[in-house]
Structure formats: structure tokens, C-alpha cells
Amino acid sequence: MNIIRAKTAGFCFGVDRAVKLTYDLLADGHKVATLGPLIHNPQVVEDLEAKGALTCPNVASVPDGYEVIIRSHGVPQTVYDEISTRRLAYHDATCPFVAKIHKIAMRADENHALLLVAGDASQDRKSVV
């Protein structure tokens, strides 16, 4: 049997970027709250919470004085609007590749084009489209 070991392992670029941003902000003394778990990795989420990050289910539950971290898969425009209404500072950790897909979807909508997205509509990565 021939065993081939992967050259790399770990998070994808977008998730790694979001995790690093959050750890850096916490290390600099910022009060941060993520909208839902930052990533789908309970050990990392627990470590972030142990360092002071809050995991909030929505913008309304973010305490005053906390900075919001937008997760790597992004959020719908309505969430940005809620953050603005509450005048909360935020850090957008949306993966650039995901943001590109969001722009394509918005352009399709503006042009009244039919946009088909396959998968579970309630899944957080697809529900923003």
C-alpha cells in the first residue's frame, strides 16, 4: 500500500483570514462579537470565546461597545443595514471569493436574470445569495 501525505492541511484561505483577524483583534484588546459561530469548528470557537469573543445569534444581541465580525461566508445586505442602524463598528471577514459570488448574484438580480442556486436554502452560505 502506498500512503500519500497531503502537503497542506487546515482552513481554507477565507476561513483562515477570518480566524486570524479575530485573534488579532482580541490580542489588541478589542471587544468582538461574531454573528453565529465564526467557523464550523467547535474547538476554535471555544478558544475564541475563552479569549473574550462573544458568539451572538444576530445583530440585536450584540452588546453596545462590541465590534462585529462578519464571518467568511458573508451575510445578507439586511445585516449590514442592522449594523449601520445600531452604529456598531464591524470587520468584514467575508472571503473575497464568496464576495465575488455575491456580486455576480446581485448583478443577475439587477438584470432580472434567473439565478439558480442548488443546495439547502437555509444553509448560511447559500442564504446570503
Where are the language model's segments positioned?
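Generic N-terminal amphipathic, Lys/Arg-enriched alpha-helix
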Residues: M1-G10, D28-K31
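Conserved small/polar residues in nucleotide/adenosyl-binding loops
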Residues: V128-V129
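Conserved phosphate/oxyanion-binding catalytic-loop motifs
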Residues: I70-P76
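Short internal beta-strands
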Residues: K31-L38, V117-G119
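Ser/Thr/Gly-rich flexible loops in soluble cytosolic domains mediating phosphotransfer, phosphorylation
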Residues: S84-A113, V117
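N-terminal beta-loop-helix "entrance" segment that forms/cooperates
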Residues: G36-A53
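Short acidic low-complexity segments
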Residues: L54-P63
